[in-house]
Curated annotation (Swiss-Prot):
Residues annotated as glycosylated: 83, 420, 468
Transmembrane segments: 633-653
Tissues expressed in: Found in mammary gland, jejunum, lung, kidney and small intestine.
Keyword Cell wall biogenesis/degradation assigned: no
Protein name, UniProt field: Polymeric immunoglobulin receptor
Disordered as annotated region, ranges: 607-627, 679-730
Keyword annotations of the record: Cell membrane, Disulfide bond, Glycoprotein, Immunoglobulin domain, Membrane, Phosphoprotein, Repeat, Secreted, Signal, Transmembrane, Transmembrane helix
Biased composition (Basic and acidic residues): 679-688
Cysteines paired by S-S bonds: 40-110, 56-64, 152-220, 257-324, 271-279, 370-440, 384-394, 481-543, 485-519, 495-502
Subunit and interaction comment: Interacts (mainly via CDR1-like domain) with dimeric IgA. Interacts (mainly via CDR2-like domain) with pentameric IgM.
Cytoplasmic compartment spans: 654-757
Species whose genome carries this gene: Bos taurus (Bovine)
GO biological process: immunoglobulin transcytosis in epithelial cells mediated by polymeric immunoglobulin receptor; signal transduction
Top-level taxonomy: Eukaryota, Metazoa, Chordata, Craniata, Vertebrata
Length: 757
């Protein structure tokens, strides 16, 4: 029973279920004896291109009788004066009707398939009588906002008499303009009389910027008495016939407004008119833009005063009538030239839906998927940033052929995957300045241009990497990227960025990450290993995640490649850690080196002078910078030795108060440490610090954690048992040995110069 009830409803309301995608002019007007051309649009699918097209007339009971169709049928009334032409490549068909009569007035439908179905559009045709035949007057027609010149002949007898033009009303004819200089207030600065000479028996009345209210009957007169020459004038003001524009949902449309060279330097506007209300400005050349079109509209001035407006990411509410015009204030006003369009937005679109807003955190990244017409797979694709300029503009940032804006180096990439109808844009290292609107554009079908809004919000990036890494020429490099547990099932990758994209590199999974303590079992470290670093390895590297063909978050690392300074000790391997862990590891490493090796400060000074870890050195650095660094190092070395001696002296004082000493060997320097100072026996063991290099050993001394990075494997051996000596004797002997080593080092630094030190 329910199925029968549903079938009855569908039979009664066949067009309620969906909006018809067929679109045409709502009203068509003409006069007897002339012809009309009616264009109807349909979605250019394969089925629609080959489906029957028809033009039918609606009867009193709602039935639509076919008059002409694409299958060759023509009714008797249309034989010899009508035809229907299909244009499948553009998704349109045109009905031409000639020799119109008043009987042709009525309501019609243009449609596809069977006339009883809902795939059609209602059209009203009105045919009126020729006004010239009806009024026996001289008919002048003029477009709204244009100029009309009315010629008024007269006899020689009235050549010296007053010439005038008046407009008829129901009871009178009020003066518009005359040859004495009078001009009505309604026509001020718009109307004047022109007399070419005494030998010419014609005077002209010129009316500029014609308004709709100017339409009507006029009397052109020479003389004021009974012998005056009079001519009846019928002035018809034509509103612009709206041009039909058919756009798919989420697609783009362009309005080309050509108002003529006479208004080339006058400000232009485009306004939208809905439900017979006022025409609200969408954009004008003075910088005004409607909020509803923010970020998805631009205007482009062209030659000869042409004003072109492009609107992207069409919405259902964008449908309606649009009017462009020229007016000094950039606002709609009667009496200025205009051009009109009727926009229909088809909801049955082939353009896939995509997010209109994407969000990313400061320092993080966003990924934008841009659709394009699959037929344009080989066309150039690019991404531009919409700017709030006077006319709105969208300068390109990156394209499929390479990066355009240098300030986006290492941050922006456009990735294409042929065949799937989309390309991907990735932007990382986000800042607040990246907030705004962006366009996805191709050189092919401009209807596929789309807009996305980028918002930068508070938060922390999900992927953890160091920002800058220094790699040594000829040595191995390991870059580590920490992924949180939410990306456990995602594909992870490393790639090397270039201005043409990001080339994938082989990676290895290092197991759980210590950077995310809330879900260690699911967080991961994925590393990139370079066995032997070359100068070509310098540049930007990205780590990221993918879920199938879709790209996710990314993080960027800059790798600077440098040569080691002569005399420096080489680390076995450079291992990059997350930014936070790297800072802690670096602090511990410096503290331990100061205690273990007096030459540390000299080494650090040389490293800093060479550039140190981080971004590339400034190419504009002065040439005298190297000499200044050498002098600075020469000054700092003695100061550093004094500081180190002070640290050791403090250690000696503390050592005198320690008892029950066990001996631990640290390189060549031996220190007595009380077993009671250790918190537990596990502190004797070296542990890998995940934020530092593999050789970092962690030891707890007096409640402080210090990290010492060794350059060679430390071997611990038991010493033979010797006679027990006092703590004071051991400390004095160690201090004396240290002072001798410091003195020798200072002498070597003075003789060999700061570079050797």
């Amino acid at each position: 029973m329910s199925r029968l009830f549903l079938a009855c409803l569908l039979a009664i309301f066949p067009v309620v279920s969906m909006k018809s995608p067929i679109f045409g002019p709502e009203e068509v007007t003409s006069v007897e004896g002339r012809s009309v051309s009616i264009k109807c649009y349909y979605p250019p699918t394969s089925v629609n291109r080959h489906t029957r097209k028809y033009w039918c007339r609606q009867g009193a009971q709602g039935r639509c009788t076919t008059l002409i169709s694409s299958e060759g049928y023509v009714s008797d009334d249309y034989v010899g004066r009508a035809n229907l032409t299909n244009f499948p490549e553009s998704g349109t068909f045109v009905v031409d009707i000639s020799h119109l009569t008043h009987k042709d007035s009525g309501r019609y439908k243009c449609g596809l398939g069977i006339s009883s179905r809902g795939l059609n559009f209602d059209v009203s045709l009105e045919v009126s009588q020729d006004p010239a035949q009806a009024s026996h007057a001289h008919v002048y027609t003029v477009d709204l906002g244009r100029t009309v010149t009315i010629n008024c002949p007269f006899t020689r007898a009235n050549s010296e008499k007053r010439k005038s033009l008046c407009k008829k009303t129901i009871q009178d004819c009020f003066q518009v303009v005359d040859s004495t200089g009078y001009v009505s207030n309604s026509y001020k600065d718009r109307a004047h009389i022109s007399i070419l000479g005494t030998n010419t028996l014609v005077f002209s009345v010129v009316i500029n910027r014609v308004k709709l209210s100017d339409a009507g009957m006029y009397v052109c007169q020479a003389g004021d008495d009974a012998k005056a020459d009079k001519i009846n004038i019928d002035l018809q003001v034509l509103e612009p016939e709206p041009e039909l524009v058919y756009g798919d949902l989420r697609s783009s449309v362009t309005f080309d407004c050509s108002l003529g060279p006479e208004v080339a330097n006058v400000p232009k506007f485009l306004c939208q008119k809905k439900n017979g209300g006022a025409c609200n400005v969408v954009i004008n050349t003075l910088g005004k833009k409607a909020q509803d079109f923010q970020g998805r509209i631009v205007s482009v001035p062209k030659d000869n005063g042409v004003f072109s407006v492009h609107i992207t990411s069409l919405r259902k509410e964008d449908a309606g009538r649009y009017v462009c015009g020229a007016q000094p204030e950039g606002e709609p006003q009667d009496g200025w030239p205009v051009q009109a369009w009727q926009l229909f937005v088809n909801e049955e679109t082939a353009i896939p839906a995509s997010p209109s807003v994407v969000k990313g955190v400061r320092g993080g990244s966003v990924t934008v998927s841009c659709p394009y017409n699959p037929k344009d797979a080989n066309s150039a694709k690019y991404w531009c940033h919409w700017e709030e300029a006077q006319n709105g503009r969208c300068p390109r940032l990156v394209e499929s052929r390479g990066l355009i804006k240098e300030q986006y180096e290492g941050r922006l990439a456009l990735l294409t995957e042929p065949g799937n109808g989309t390309y991907t844009v990735i932007l990382n290292q986000l800042t607040d300045q990246d907030t705004g609107f962006y366009w996805c554009v191709t050189d092919g079908d401009t209807r596929w241009i789309s807009t996305v809004e980028l918002k930068v919000v508070q938060g922390e990036p999900s992927l953890k990497v160091p920002k800058n890494v220094t790699a040594w020429l000829g040595e191995p490099l390991k870059l580590s990227c920490h992924f949180p547990c939410k990306f456990y099932s995602f594909e992870k990758y490393w790639c090397k960025w270039s201005n043409r994209g990001c080339s994938a590199l082989p990676t290895q999974n290092d197991g759980p990450s210590q950077a995310f303590v809330s879900c260690d079992q699911n967080s991961q470290v994925v590393s990139l290993n370079l066995d032997t670093v070359t100068k070509e390895d310098e540049g930007w590297y990205w780590c990221g995640v993918k879920e199938g063909p879709r790209y996710g978050e990314t993080a960027a690392v800059y790798v600077a490649v440098e040569s080691r300074v002569k005399g420096s000790q080489g680390a076995k391997q450079v291992k990059a850690a997350p930014a936070g862990a790297a800072i802690q590891s670096r602090a511990g490493e410096i503290q331990n080196k100061a205690l273990l090796d007096p030459s540390f400060f000299a080494k650090e000074s040389v490293k800093d002078a060479a550039g140190g870890p981080g971004a590339p050195a400034d190419p504009g650095r002065p040439t005298g910078y190297s000499g200044s660094s050498k002098a600075l190092v020469s000054t700092l070395v003695p100061l550093a030795l004094v500081l180190v001696a002070g640290v050791v002296a403090i250690g000696v004082v503390r050592a005198r108060h320690r008892k029950n000493v066990d001996r631990i060997s640290i390189r060549s320097y031996r220190t007595d440490i009380s077993m009671s100072d250790f918190e537990n026996s596990r502190d004797f063991e070296g542990r890998d610090n995940m934020g530092a290099s593999p050789e970092a050993q962690e030891t707890s001394l007096g409640g402080k954690d210090e990290f010492a990075t060794t350059t060679e494997d430390t071997v611990e051996s038991k010493e033979p048992k010797k006679a027990k000596r006092s703590s004071k004797e051991e400390a004095d002997e160690a201090f004396t040995t240290f002072l001798l080593q410091a003195k020798n080092l200072a002498s070597a630094a003075t003789q060999n110069g700061p570079t050797e030190a």
